[in-house]
Each structure stands twice: as structure tokens, then as C-alpha cells.
Regions:
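Short, flexible helix-adjacent loops and helix caps
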Residues: 2-9, 41, 70-73, 99, ...
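Short beta-strand "wing" residues that participate in macromolecule-binding interfaces
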Residues: 76
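Hydrophobic alpha-helical connector segments
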Residues: 2-34, 53-54, 58-60, 80-84
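Helical hydrophobic small-molecule/effector-binding pocket
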Residues: 3, 16-38, 45-48, 91-99, ...
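C-terminal peripheral helix-coil segments that are non-catalytic and often amphipathic
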Residues: 28, 59, 63-71, 89-142
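A short, mixed-charge helix-start or loop-turn motif at secondary-structure junctions
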Residues: 4, 43-47, 107-111
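Amphipathic alpha-helical packing segments from all-alpha helical-bundle domains
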Residues: 2-3, 45-71, 81-85, 116-120
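A general secondary-structure junction signal
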Residues: 39-40, 82
Length: 142
């Protein structure tokens, strides 16, 4: 569990690369995604296994987002906790709900074509997470 919570801390600074990194991590560890779903079916309003340690790890992840915002790598006009939650959702949803993925895209989340397309989508979407100056610099590199 500690290793999975470390994703936020070890992710690349660049928003596009960070989303691609998380998506790749979720694709490689579908069992973890399923375990989180199973856990969610329980009584999650109460403490979960390793609650204090996991909360600390997630707060460290929020701190990393806040720090990247302060450095001008991510937009500063969005709440860092909500931004991290959205990033987790964008990168794990296809593995967590493969039926939606297949129904919406015609591909399974395990299909290489889906992985390639979703990674490209996440990179493009991440452009909107960058401050305007960072966005212009990223576009110039393409």
C-alpha cells in the first residue's frame, strides 16, 4: 500500500508526464485498482486498513501538487486536493471500470491501442493544467 501511495510523490514534475506515469502505473497494477474498489464496497466512512499512514501519504501527495503549483508547473487557481483527486480518477478509471472503457471507446483497457490513445489524451489534457507560460513552452517543444 505504501508503494502505491508513493505514486504521487515519485511522479514526474511535468503535468503531462505525471498523468502518463500514473496511468501506466495503474495499467501495470490492476490488482491494486481492484483492491481499492473492493475496499470501497465496505464501510469506508470508518477508518480503512492503514488509514493514518495512507492519509499521511496522500497529504504528502497534495503537498507535492501544491509545491508544483508554487513553482509554476501547475495552475495555481485550482485546489491541490481536488486536482490530485481528478488526476487519480483520470488515470485509474479505465482499469477500475473496464466495462465503461469498452462501451465508450470500443477497446478494452488492456488493449495496446487503448493504452496508446489514452496516454496521448492525458498528455493533451494536461496542457490545460499548466499555467499559460508553461503551456506555451510545451507547445514550442512539439
Amino acid at each position: 500500500m505504501r508503494e502505491r501511495a508513493a505514486w504521487a510523490v515519485t511522479a514526474p514534475d511535468d503535468a503531462a508526464e505525471s498523468l502518463a506515469f500514473w496511468f501506466d502505473s495503474a495499467c501495470r497494477d490492476r490488482d491494486w485498482v481492484r483492491l481499492m474498489e473492493w475496499e470501497a464496497l465496505g464501510r469506508v466512512e470508518h477508518a480503512v486498513n492503514g488509514d493514518a499512514e495512507r492519509r499521511a501519504a496522500f497529504q504528502q501527495g497534495v503537498g507535492q501538487v501544491r509545491e508544483r503549483q508554487a513553482r509554476g508547473l501547475l495552475r495555481a487557481d485550482v485546489d491541490p486536493g481536488h486536482l490530485l483527486l481528478a488526476m487519480v480518477a483520470l488515470t485509474t478509471f479505465p482499469a477500475a471500470f473496464p466495462q465503461f472503457t469498452r462501451l465508450l471507446t470500443g477497446l478494452r483497457p488492456t488493449d495496446q491501442a487503448f493504452v496508446t490513445r489514452h496516454s496521448a489524451f492525458l498528455r493533451r489534457l494536461a496542457d490545460g493544467l499548466r499555467p499559460p507560460r508553461q503551456r506555451q513552452a510545451a507547445e514550442a517543444r512539439r
